[in-house]
């Protein structure tokens, strides 16, 4: 009993000491020059490791990047930004070990055809639904290594719409059979019919994986209005034989008039960039020879929104821009020219700033046993991927590198 009382008094004394010395931390604060040097070397190793390269490729002799390659790079970067925003809202993070290695990016535009080829015959053509077909056979041999697939379509305003909002639903088209449904539901969205243009993204990973494994199952995707072929009165009653019209319009599908002058070929390429397309992230087989380095990450805490706007002295994310040419001496990366890698820095005060009871216990235990373990340090918590465009010889490549941008930090 006496021993327990002595331990309790020691803990209380330590708590009081920690309250007085809130800025105490055994993690040494490094100068910026030293931090940047270490961060640059870490990034150099990370990029080469994720690409499974032992040394940087030779700079390409190509000075002009084709428009289609730049369009793929821009689409991928926009998609990753959207995906990160969705994960933040849902407080979810990917945990697959395959997340570590770089992914090859493939873009497949919708197969263009006559108007009736993009519509279904269940309801009057062009009124209630649109069909989108894609040829992904070129990556079938690597189908089992699909990491993620996104269907993207650009909604454009419809000034002549009679309603301000309409619900659309995305389906995978299945082979007709009397025992199964013709469609498989993927997702739905309530959208404005007017307003400004916006990209819509749907996760179609499972659907595309099925297409890659069984080519005959690739019958396309369909966007239709909710409860097609009926119009509803304000009280909810159905008006038979009166069809609700799809008033949501999509770029590259609804035959909008694009009047313009100049080089028609250039205009066509620019319009193709906004047409419906699939973006596939594939893991090359040679990058799956050894296990990745993925892991769980918790919800963001000390992020860029807070740290970049406040003069926080304790643990926070700090801005750090890496220029590929100046800092790494690399000329083989065409896009981007550099990026904000950022880093975590600042002391981790006991009790007040530690975000978990675990960190507090570590601090107290370290005071009791200074030789036994390390105290909490400021480390990355949430990281974002980076998209790069580079050449191997004359072959352009667009790839996604995971966990390259520090977005938030924590004491651990």
Swiss-Prot record:
A Gene Ontology term for the protein's cellular component: cell surface
Record note on modification: Transforming growth factor beta-3 proprotein: The precursor proprotein is cleaved in the Golgi apparatus to form Transforming growth factor beta-3 (TGF-beta-3) and Latency-associated peptide (LAP) chains, which remain non-covalently linked, rendering TGF-beta-3 inactive.
One GO term (biological process): inner ear development
Disulphide bonds in the chain: 307-316, 315-378, 344-409, 348-411
Signal peptide region: 1-23
Domain of life: Eukaryota
Chain segments annotated as transmembrane: none
Keywords of the record: Cleavage on pair of basic residues, Disulfide bond, Extracellular matrix, Glycoprotein, Growth factor, Methylation, Mitogen, Secreted, Signal
Motif (Cell attachment site): 261-263
Residues bearing attached sugar chains per UniProt: 74, 135, 142
Description of how the protein assembles with itself and partners: Interacts with ASPN. Latency-associated peptide: Homodimer; disulfide-linked. Latency-associated peptide: Interacts with Transforming growth factor beta-3 (TGF-beta-3) chain; interaction is non-covalent and maintains (TGF-beta-3) in a latent state. Latency-associated peptide: Interacts with LRRC32/GARP; leading to regulate activation of TGF-beta-3 and promote epithelial fusion during palate development. Latency-associated peptide: Interacts (via cell attachment site) with integrins, leading to release of the active TGF-beta-3. Transforming growth factor beta-3: Homodimer; disulfide-linked.
Function recorded in the entry: Transforming growth factor beta-3 proprotein: Precursor of the Latency-associated peptide (LAP) and Transforming growth factor beta-3 (TGF-beta-3) chains, which constitute the regulatory and active subunit of TGF-beta-3, respectively. Transforming growth factor beta-3: Multifunctional protein that regulates embryogenesis and cell differentiation and is required in various processes such as secondary palate development. Activation into mature form follows different steps: following cleavage of the proprotein in the Golgi apparatus, Latency-associated peptide (LAP) and Transforming growth factor beta-3 (TGF-beta-3) chains remain non-covalently linked rendering TGF-beta-3 inactive during storage in extracellular matrix.
Similarity remark: Belongs to the TGF-beta family.
Descriptive protein name: Transforming growth factor beta-3 proprotein
């Amino acid at each position: 009993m006496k021993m327990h009382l002595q331990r309790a008094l020691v803990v209380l004394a330590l708590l009081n000491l920690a309250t007085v010395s809130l800025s105490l931390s055994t993690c040494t604060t490094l100068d910026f020059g030293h931090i940047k040097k270490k961060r640059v070397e870490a990034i150099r190793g990370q990029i080469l490791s994720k690409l499974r390269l032992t040394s940087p490729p030779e700079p390409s002799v190509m000075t002009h990047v084709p428009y289609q390659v730049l369009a793929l790079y821009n689409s991928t970067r926009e998609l990753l930004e959207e995906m990160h925003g969705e994960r933040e809202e849902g407080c979810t993070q990917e945990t697959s070990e395959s997340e570590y290695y770089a992914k090859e990016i493939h873009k497949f535009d919708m197969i263009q055809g006559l108007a009736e080829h993009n519509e279904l015959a269940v309801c009057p053509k062009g009124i209630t639904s649109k069909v989108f077909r894609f040829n992904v056979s070129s990556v079938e041999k690597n189908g089992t290594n699909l990491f993620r697939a996104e269907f993207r379509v650009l909604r454009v305003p419809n000034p002549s719409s009679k309603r301000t909002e309409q619900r659309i639903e995305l389906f995978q088209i299945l082979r007709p059979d009397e025992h199964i449904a013709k469609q498989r539901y993927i997702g739905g969205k309530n959208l404005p019919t007017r307003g400004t243009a916006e990209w819509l993204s749907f996760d179609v990973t499972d659907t595309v994986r099925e297409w890659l494994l069984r080519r005959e199952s690739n019958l396309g995707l369909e966007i239709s209005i909710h409860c097609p072929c009926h119009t509803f009165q304000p009280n909810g009653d159905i008006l038979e034989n009166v069809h609700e019209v799809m008033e949501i319009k999509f770029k590259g599908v609804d035959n909008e008039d694009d009047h313009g002058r100049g080089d028609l070929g250039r205009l066509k390429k620019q319009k193709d960039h906004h047409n419906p397309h699939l973006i596939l992230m594939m893991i090359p087989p040679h990058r799956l020879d050894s296990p990745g380095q993925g892991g769980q990450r918790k919800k963001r805490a000390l992020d860029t929104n807070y740290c970049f706007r406040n003069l926080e002295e304790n643990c926070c994310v700090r801005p750090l821009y890496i220029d590929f040419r100046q800092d790494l001496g690399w000329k083989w990366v065409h896009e981007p020219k550099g990026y904000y890698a950022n880093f975590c820095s600042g002391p981790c005060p006991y009790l007040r700033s530690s975000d978990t009871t675990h960190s507090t216990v570590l601090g107290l235990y370290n005071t009791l046993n200074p030789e036994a373990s390390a105290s909490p340090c400021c480390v990355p918590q949430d990281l974002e991927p980076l998209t790069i465009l580079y050449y191997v010889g004359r072959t352009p490549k667009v790839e996604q590198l995971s966990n390259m941008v520090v977005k938030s930090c924590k004491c651990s």
